[in-house]
């Protein structure tokens, strides 16, 4: 008789947990994958920054989107999702002229794909995003990545241009990782 009672208590606790916590809970491995992506981006460095000085530019990274204090959890989840998609697209579909070590690039793309799988398994409606339109945030990120794509095109996808983009994405992905850590700590 104790077993059915324990089972009932477990069901009640699970129901309360799902009702009380509408936001998506990403697996612990998701955070580790973020740090792995950052490590891989660092290892992909092929050129010194000083040899590409004439390629420097300001991509106007939208820092305000990554302020963990300003964004609700559902909004932060959406920003993380869009940013991860854009980074995946940039590195994993524009590879024909990229100067990367293919082993590192494949590992990076695999890690980003796993992160997207985690995020896709978390429906945005469940995370409370149905009531929180993010047109501004989405548009801002799209514009940021358009600037990066145009920069690569304008410089014919040269190794120095890719190096500047790799460094920029490393900095922006670091901000993304910090945003996720802040949201995670708030729970």
UniProtKB/Swiss-Prot annotation:
<dbReference type="GO" id="GO:0006959">
    <property type="term" value="P:humoral immune response"/>
</dbReference>
<keyword id="KW-0051">Antiviral defense</keyword>
<feature type="signal peptide">
    <location>
        <begin position="1"/>
        <end position="23"/>
    </location>
</feature>
<keyword id="KW-0325">Glycoprotein</keyword>
<comment type="similarity">
    <text>Belongs to the alpha/beta interferon family.</text>
</comment>
<dbReference type="GO" id="GO:0051607">
    <property type="term" value="P:defense response to virus"/>
</dbReference>
<protein>
    <recommendedName>
        <fullName>Interferon alpha-3</fullName>
    </recommendedName>
</protein>
<dbReference type="GO" id="GO:0002323">
    <property type="term" value="P:natural killer cell activation involved in immune response"/>
</dbReference>
<feature type="glycosylation site" description="N-linked (GlcNAc...) asparagine">
    <location>
        <position position="101"/>
    </location>
</feature>
<comment type="function">
    <text>Produced by macrophages, IFN-alpha have antiviral activities. Interferon stimulates the production of two enzymes: a protein kinase and an oligoadenylate synthetase.</text>
</comment>
<keyword id="KW-1015">Disulfide bond</keyword>
<dbReference type="InterPro" id="IPR000471">
    <property type="entry name" value="Interferon_alpha/beta/delta"/>
</dbReference>
<feature type="disulfide bond">
    <location>
        <begin position="24"/>
        <end position="122"/>
    </location>
</feature>
<dbReference type="GO" id="GO:0002250">
    <property type="term" value="P:adaptive immune response"/>
</dbReference>
<keyword id="KW-0964">Secreted</keyword>
<dbReference type="GO" id="GO:0002312">
    <property type="term" value="P:B cell activation involved in immune response"/>
</dbReference>
<dbReference type="InterPro" id="IPR009079">
    <property type="entry name" value="4_helix_cytokine-like_core"/>
</dbReference>
<feature type="disulfide bond">
    <location>
        <begin position="52"/>
        <end position="160"/>
    </location>
</feature>
<dbReference type="GO" id="GO:0005132">
    <property type="term" value="F:type I interferon receptor binding"/>
</dbReference>
<dbReference type="GO" id="GO:0002286">
    <property type="term" value="P:T cell activation involved in immune response"/>
</dbReference>
<feature type="glycosylation site" description="N-linked (GlcNAc...) asparagine">
    <location>
        <position position="94"/>
    </location>
</feature>
<dbReference type="GO" id="GO:0005615">
    <property type="term" value="C:extracellular space"/>
</dbReference>
<keyword id="KW-0202">Cytokine</keyword>
<dbReference type="GO" id="GO:0060337">
    <property type="term" value="P:type I interferon-mediated signaling pathway"/>
</dbReference>
<dbReference type="Pfam" id="PF00143">
    <property type="entry name" value="Interferon"/>
</dbReference>
<dbReference type="GO" id="GO:0005125">
    <property type="term" value="F:cytokine activity"/>
</dbReference>
<dbReference type="GO" id="GO:0043330">
    <property type="term" value="P:response to exogenous dsRNA"/>
</dbReference>
<keyword id="KW-0732">Signal</keyword>
């Amino acid at each position: 008789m104790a077993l059915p009672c324990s089972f009932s208590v477990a069901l009640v606790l699970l129901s309360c947990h799902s009702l009380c916590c509408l936001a998506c809970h990403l697996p612990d491995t998701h955070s580790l994958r973020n740090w792995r992506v950052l490590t891989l981006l660092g290892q992909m460095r092929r050129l010194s920054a000083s040899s590409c000085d004439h390629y420097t530019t300001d991509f106007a990274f939208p820092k305000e989107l990554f302020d963990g204090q300003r964004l609700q959890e559902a909004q932060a989840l959406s920003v993380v999702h869009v940013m991860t998609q854009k980074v995946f697209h940039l590195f994993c579909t524009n590879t024909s002229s990229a100067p990367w070590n293919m082993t590192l690039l494949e590992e990076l793309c695999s890690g980003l794909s796993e992160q997207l799988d985690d995020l896709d398994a978390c429906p945005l409606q469940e995370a409370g995003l149905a009531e929180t339109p993010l047109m501004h945030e989405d548009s801002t990120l799209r514009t940021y990545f358009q600037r990066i794509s145009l920069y690569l095109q304008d410089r014919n996808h040269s190794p120095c241009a890719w190096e500047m983009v790799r460094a920029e994405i490393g900095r922006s992905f670091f901000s993304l990782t910090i945003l996720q850590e802040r949201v995670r700590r708030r729970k």
